């Protein structure tokens, strides 16, 4: 116990130390004189690593000296730079990054808007994949005026693929029983446990999905590179990779050079007096300029990313909530937005990027949006990389839904159940004893199978949830019951397909959704609407409320204590093991 509390206070002390150190560093940075913007600036940006949707609620000091720009920061800054006469162009150094398909389309569209204002946009990378993995980064690069590749780099524009494991034979060998139900044939999330091979319905669904996404990529690449679509298709199917010179010969590249030389080329392209200027420094400049907002009420932009849960769990390492869409957290945000004592937002844009989650918090969030609409506040949902299952459940409450062409959309279905381990335990000589006040108190335990009555009741619950989900879609999207069932069955669609099926209203990025919300609210179209972002960025005080706030209530204290106990036990009794 003494070791446990030693570790506990060591973590707390470390958090306080780094928070204060980070705050001092940030104050030092803020106190430095701002770099003067050159008259002919070329913005330099590295796109690599983790690029979050928004800076969110993670306090700045926890990142010490620097905090990476979010995707929203990038696109807003590019839009600002497009209208700035001092900015002549952009040069990007592209590295491995976390951008998904829809986010790549967001960034491509921002680059296109930048170029449409007469600016040049250049991009360089050391390689577009190695044998594989180059399609998505090349898709991003194709939106730029010029693409440069380092010597010895490759262009692995090889298309898209999915690989899924099917572990039924392994589970059978270990006498583990996967007891799952799904509604309907395309809701195959649990098939990895229940089947030995991919089902034909899953193969049909995923093949159609990848083909539609790849068709969008080929169409966009062909347009920007001034190539024939058949030629781009042939390139994607003919060889695993092209070396730099061969890729240039085929029209995929403009230059084969090193990044330092490419920067010099970009500076000269801006004309006499052209100078490189860091994108992050310009972003700070743009944020200050951007405070000159319209006189209209602001639009509330709420970011919601991750699995949908009732309450976000707390990491025992960082002492901060893990990334999730928490109905509790969103309830707090919307209670603030709808507070009758405060000015109401002109509209609400909810940015959803989620693979789904539990139906109960999904329904809670659905109600938050309908409450907002009842107060005559327009609601627009912008869907990111995906809005599947519970993510789409939430979206059905919106006045309008905006998605990218590649957004994974739908999965209108239900799956659930449990892994049954009783035979595995017996195999290793372990017996579980239990006591209960009723026959069904232990129904969801993995240590015993469902009884026939419990399995029937569980399936009835799955049917009820599925029917309820269908009703939400039918009413929210104004579709007949027959049409709703046709597009449901657990199937996922691209945003482009979803538009044709009536599941979304418009294709576009987050900025398109904000503009649409402004139109619904009747805001002045001649000015850029003011936007207030939620969750709000916290300062130093937010660290302690975020980290220690859960200690103020019993459930939070229990969760945090369990996390510390798991960490302390694993470090002392089993040094080689870390719980996941």
Question: Where are the regions that the model predicts?
Answer:
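Cleft-lining beta-strand/loop regions that shape enzyme active-site pockets
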Residues: 34, 41-164, 291-424
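Intrinsic disorder and flexible/low-complexity segments
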Residues: 296-345, 461, 534-580
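Charged, glycine-interspersed solvent-exposed loop segments at helix/strand-loop junctions
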Residues: 164, 168-267, 422, 426-524
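Non-catalytic accessory/assembly modules
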Residues: 13-20, 34-37, 62, 78, ...
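C-terminal recognition in membrane/secretory proteostasis and scaffolding
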Residues: 351-352, 427, 519, 524, ...
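Active-site proximal loops enriched in glycine and acidic residues that flank catalytic Cys/His/Asp
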Residues: 303-306, 352-354, 383-385, 398, ...
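C-terminal long alpha-helix characteristic of the crotonase
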Residues: 223-224, 254-298, 415, 471-476, ...
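Hydrophobic alpha-helical transmembrane signal-anchor segments
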Residues: 2-35, 39-40
């Amino acid at each position: 116990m003494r070791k446990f509390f030693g570790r506990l206070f060591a973590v707390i002390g470390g958090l306080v130390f780094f928070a204060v150190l980070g705050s001092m560093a940030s104050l030092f940075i803020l106190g430095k004189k701002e770099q003067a913007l050159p008259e002919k600036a070329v913005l330099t940006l590295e796109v690599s690593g983790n690029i979050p949707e928004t800076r969110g609620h993670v306090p700045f000091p926890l990142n010490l000296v620097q905090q990476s720009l979010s995707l929203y920061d990038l696109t807003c800054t590019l839009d600002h730079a497009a209208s700035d006469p001092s900015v002549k162009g952009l040069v990007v150094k592209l590295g491995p990054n976390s951008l998904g398909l829809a986010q790549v389309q967001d960034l491509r569209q921002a680059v296109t808007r930048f170029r449409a204002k007469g600016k040049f946009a250049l991009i360089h990378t050391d390689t577009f994949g190695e044998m594989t993995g180059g399609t998505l980064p090349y898709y991003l690069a194709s939106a730029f005026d010029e693409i440069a590749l380092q010597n010895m780099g490759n262009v692995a524009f090889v298309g898209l693929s999915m690989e899924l494991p099917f572990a039924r034979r392994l589970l059978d060998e270990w006498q583990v029983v996967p007891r799952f139900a799904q509604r309907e044939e395309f809701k195959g999330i649990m098939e990895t446990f229940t089947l030995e091979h991919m089902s034909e319905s899953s193969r049909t669904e995923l093949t159609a999905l990848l083909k539609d996404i790849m068709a969008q990529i080929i169409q966009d690449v062909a347009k920007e590179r001034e190539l024939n679509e058949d030629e781009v298709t042939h390139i994607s199917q003919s060889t695993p990779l092209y070396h730099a010179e061969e890729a240039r010969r085929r029209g995929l590249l403009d230059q084969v050079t090193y990044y330092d030389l490419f920067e010099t080329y970009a500076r000269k392209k801006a004309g006499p007096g052209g100078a490189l200027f860091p994108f992050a420094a310009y972003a700070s400049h743009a944020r200050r300029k951007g405070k000159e907002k319209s006189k209209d009420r602001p639009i509330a932009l709420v970011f919601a990313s991750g699995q949908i849960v009732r309450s976000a769990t707390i990491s025992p390492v960082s002492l901060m909530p893990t990334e999730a869409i928490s109905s509790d957290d969103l309830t707090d945000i919307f209670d603030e937005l709808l507070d009758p004592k405060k000015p109401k937002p002109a509209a609400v844009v909810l940015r959803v990027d989620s693979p789904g989650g539990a139906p109960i918090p999904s329904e809670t969030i659905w109600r938050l949006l309908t409450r907002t609409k009842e107060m005559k506040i327009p609601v627009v949902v912008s869907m990111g990389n995906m809005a599947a299952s519970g993510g789409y459940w939430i979206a059905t409450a919106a006045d309008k839904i905006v998605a990218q062409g590649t957004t994974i959309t739908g999965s209108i279905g239900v799956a659930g159940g449990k892994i049954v381990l009783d035979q595995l335990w017996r195999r290793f000589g372990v017996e579980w004893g239990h006591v209960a006040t009723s026959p069904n108190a232990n129904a969801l335990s993995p240590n015993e199978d469902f009884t026939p009555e419990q399995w029937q009741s569980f399936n009835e619950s799955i049917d009820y949830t599925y029917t309820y989900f269908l009703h939400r879609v039918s009413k929210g999207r104004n579709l007949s019951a027959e049409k709703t069932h046709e597009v449901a069955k657990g199937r996922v669609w691209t945003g482009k397909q979803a538009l044709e099926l009536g599941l979304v209203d418009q294709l576009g990025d987050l900025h398109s959704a904000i503009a649409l919300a402004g139109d619904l609210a009747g805001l002045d179209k001649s000015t850029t609407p003011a936007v207030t972002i939620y969750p709000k960025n916290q300062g130093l005080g937010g660290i302690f409320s975020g980290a220690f706030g859960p200690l103020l209530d019993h459930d939070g204290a229990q969760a945090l204590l369990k996390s510390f106990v798991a960490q302390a036990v694993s470090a002392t009794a089993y040094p080689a093991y870390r719980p996941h």
